[in-house]
């Protein structure tokens, strides 16, 4: 039994501390043990067998492995107990993630029986960078409702229930909390890497741009859906540009553009330099070409740029570029684009208020536009420099204006044509052709077909002047002899019209003859000749005839000179004997010649017909009189009202 000498009744009779000395049974001079010899010097011989270096058997290896495994489990359990001791709550983990905290720190059984478990918060990963994390366990995540911790104590009270818990958790996860000031200390390279790791880089760049410049990028640009659509003006926003590149960008872009408006924003939240530039290239480019060009000049990836065409119809966007161009924050080279000047100069703004139909009609008349589609398309393209065209585009009655313009232009053209004689008309058509051709190919082609030129010239003279009984010329012959090519080239030069018997079921098929100087009926068949023999004898005579017009009253007209092509020779058939005296017939028996390259040997073009009529004007009785040798003294047509000057 152990010795009971000691302090068993400590603290029962008094309050406080007192010293107790240990009792030693051995006295000086006594031998400690019988088996110990103090006279023997310590030579270390007793430590010879301290290390067991005997060969290890197979059973010993298994026992040693088991011992190592048990020791490792014990060490791991001790570390886990230490971690649990210093955790303020199962929902607060050094990892900073609720999911990992619950999975790693709480046992599965305890997690299964928990009754009041807090819902998991929705998280949104922003920038994944290992440089931000301290321990390297994972990437930082920012919660939608961020839990802010100060001095190791969460604001929502999840730090534990006891004082000991709070004291033990004072120094825990504050090293994982990164404030905004700490994140802003990262380099520009880190910011660029963060952009690359974003799920939607384009949306991030739009947000960065609005933070930098205080307005949305879409306020200045319109959107092109396709990357292949070309445009001359482009707005580009670039992020993460190095300062050395920014200094030389102005000179690098000059050979490619005629106008540049450059704005630099330096060191915005360590994002590097941010570029906003409006460029007008020398040639139109698409978005892909602009991206490759500027990525090379700025030395940044293509997905770090926003590239869209500017809003040329927005006065707000034009005012922004104008105001920034006169400030010291921009570098501007070249002439200001017309769409900016048009919307920022007072005179242009006053002129854009109202649309004048007379100016549109005058433009269509001067440029020979009578088709509604041509008028609408061509006049809309003038909106960049014509204030009246811009007002036309801003109007809600564009279709009505186009229809009215085409109608008025046709009326003016028809009245002008009816007022001219055939001599004046040929001169008018010749003045529209700038080239000087050769009349000989036409004569050579007629000789190739076996037609006597003098006879053809005399009958052509009667046909041009609309002589009765000589008002119709028919050219007949086998296929591929050049009948249609010859007549079509002549009608094109004279500005005539073409009628088709295919519409004979409608009695309006002759209506184009009302507004024509000459006409052509191509490829007349047996039924067509029968119709002409039955209903059109008076028309072939060149006498006045009543023509029915659609949605209009009957018109009394004199048939214009008429050309007819056909494969049928009416002079060989008895039933067309009443047309013999009304139709002048020429035969084309020979095929139309072509060279080895497939080109026509005899060129029948407008320039050659112009030279033909100018050369043979005397023979055709269309030469200018002596009074007209000095030029046309008539005033040009003008439908725009002039300014009346009133004297005082």
Swiss-Prot record:
Give the residues the record marks as binding ATP: 477-484
Q: What UniProt keywords apply to this chain's record, in alphabetical order? A: ATP-binding, DNA replication, DNA-binding, Early protein, Helicase, Host nucleus, Hydrolase, Isomerase, Isopeptide bond, Nucleotide-binding, Phosphoprotein, Ubl conjugation
Which GO terms are recorded in the biological process aspect for this UniProt protein?
Answer: DNA replication
Stretches for region DNA-binding region = 184-352
Which positions does the motif Nuclear export signal occupy? 106-115
User: What ranges does the record list as Basic and acidic residues composition bias?
Assistant: 163-185
Q: Which reaction does it catalyse?
A: Couples ATP hydrolysis with the unwinding of duplex DNA by translocating in the 3'-5' direction; ATP + H2O = ADP + phosphate + H(+)
GO molecular function per UniProt: ATP binding; ATP hydrolysis activity; DNA binding; DNA helicase activity
A GO CC term? host cell nucleus
Q: Is Hydrolase among the key words of this record?
A: yes
- Cross-link Glycyl lysine isopeptide (Lys-Gly) (interchain with G-Cter in SUMO): which residues? 558
Which Enzyme Commission numbers does its entry carry?
A: 5.6.2.4
Q: Which modifications occur after translation, per UniProt? A: Phosphorylated. Sumoylated.
Annotated compartments:
Host nucleus
Sequence motif Nuclear localization signal, location on chain? 83-85
The protein's job, in short, is: ATP-dependent DNA 3'-5' helicase required for initiation of viral DNA replication. It forms a complex with the viral E2 protein. The E1-E2 complex binds to the replication origin which contains binding sites for both proteins. During the initial step, a dimer of E1 interacts with a dimer of protein E2 leading to a complex that binds the viral origin of replication with high specificity. Then, a second dimer of E1 displaces the E2 dimer in an ATP-dependent manner to form the E1 tetramer.
Q: Which family does it belong to?
A: Belongs to the papillomaviridae E1 protein family.
Q: What is this protein called?
A: Replication protein E1
Q: Which organism is it from?
A: Pygmy chimpanzee papillomavirus type 1C
Give the classification, highest ranks: Viruses, Monodnaviria, Shotokuvirae, Cossaviricota, Papovaviricetes
């Amino acid at each position: 039994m152990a010795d009971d000498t000691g302090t068993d009744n400590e603290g029962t009779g008094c309050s406080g501390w007192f010293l107790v000395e240990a009792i030693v049974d051995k006295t000086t001079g006594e031998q400690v043990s019988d088996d110990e010899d103090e006279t023997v010097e310590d030579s270390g011989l007793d430590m010879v067998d301290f290390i067991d270096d005997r060969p290890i058997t197979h059973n010993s290896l298994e026992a040693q492995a088991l011992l190592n495994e048990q020791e490792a489990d014990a060490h791991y359990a001790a570390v886990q107990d230490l971690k649990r001791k210093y955790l303020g709550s199962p929902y607060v983990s050094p990892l900073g993630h609720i999911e990992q905290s619950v999975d790693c720190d709480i046992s599965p059984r305890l997690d299964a029986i928990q009754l009041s478990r807090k819902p998991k918060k929705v998280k949104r990963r922003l920038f994944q960078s290992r440089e931000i994390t301290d321990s390297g366990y994972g990437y930082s995540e920012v919660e939608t409702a961020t839990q802010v911790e100060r001095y190791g104590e969460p604001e929502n009270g999840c730090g534990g229930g006891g004082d000991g818990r709070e004291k033990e958790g004072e120094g825990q996860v504050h090293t994982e909390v990164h404030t905004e000031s700490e994140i802003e200390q990262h380099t520009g390279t880190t910011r660029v890497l963060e952009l690359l790791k974003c799920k939607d880089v384009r949306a991030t760049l739009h947000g960065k741009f609005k933070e930098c410049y205080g307005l949305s990028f879409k306020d200045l640009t319109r959107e092109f859906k396709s990357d292949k659509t070309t445009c001359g003006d482009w707005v580009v926003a670039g992020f993460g540009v190095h300062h050395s590149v920014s200094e030389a960008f102005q000179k690098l872009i000059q050979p490619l553009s005629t106008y540049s408006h450059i704005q630099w924003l330096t060191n915005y939240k360590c994002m590097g330099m941010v570029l906003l530039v409006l460029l007008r290239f020398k040639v139109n480019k698409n978005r892909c070409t602009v991206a490759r060009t500027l990525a090379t000049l700025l030395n940044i990836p293509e997905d770090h740029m926003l590239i869209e065409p500017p809003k040329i119809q927005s006065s707000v966007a034009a005012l922004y570029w104008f105001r920034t161009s006169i400030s010291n924050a921009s570098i501007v080279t070249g002439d200001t684009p017309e769409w900016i000047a048009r919307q920022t100069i007072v005179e242009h703004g006053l002129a854009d208020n109202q649309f004048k139909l007379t100016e549109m009609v005058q433009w269509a008349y001067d440029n020979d536009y009578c088709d509604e589609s041509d008028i609408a398309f061509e006049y809309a393209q003038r909106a960049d420099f014509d204030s009246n065209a811009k007002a036309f585009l801003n109007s809600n009655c564009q279709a009505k204006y186009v229809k009215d313009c085409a109608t008025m232009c046709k009326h003016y053209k028809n009245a002008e044509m009816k007022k001219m004689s055939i001599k004046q008309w040929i001169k008018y058509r010749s003045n529209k052709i700038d080239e000087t051709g050769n009349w000989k190919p036409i004569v050579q082609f007629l000789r190739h077909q076996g037609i006597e030129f003098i006879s053809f010239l005399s009958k052509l003279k009667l046909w041009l002047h609309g002589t009765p009984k000589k008002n119709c010329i028919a050219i007949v012959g086998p296929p591929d002899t050049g009948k249609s090519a010859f007549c079509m080239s002549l009608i094109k030069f004279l500005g005539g019209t073409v009628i088709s018997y295919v519409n004979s079921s409608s009695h309006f098929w002759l209506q184009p003859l009302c507004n024509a100087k000459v006409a052509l009926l191509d490829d007349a068949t047996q039924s067509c000749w029968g119709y002409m023999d039955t209903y059109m004898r008076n028309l072939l005579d060149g006498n006045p005839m009543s023509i029915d017009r659609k949605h209009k009253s009957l018109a009394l007209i004199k048939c214009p000179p008429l050309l007819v092509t056909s494969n049928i020779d009416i002079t060989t058939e008895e039933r067309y004997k009443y047309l013999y005296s009304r139709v002048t017939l020429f035969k084309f028996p020979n095929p139309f010649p072509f060279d080895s390259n497939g080109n026509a040997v005899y060129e029948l073009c407008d320039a050659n017909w112009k030279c033909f009529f100018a050369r043979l004007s005397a023979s055709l009785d269309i030469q200018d009189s002596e009074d007209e040798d000095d030029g046309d003294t008539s005033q040009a047509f003008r439908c725009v009202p002039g300014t009346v000057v009133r004297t005082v």
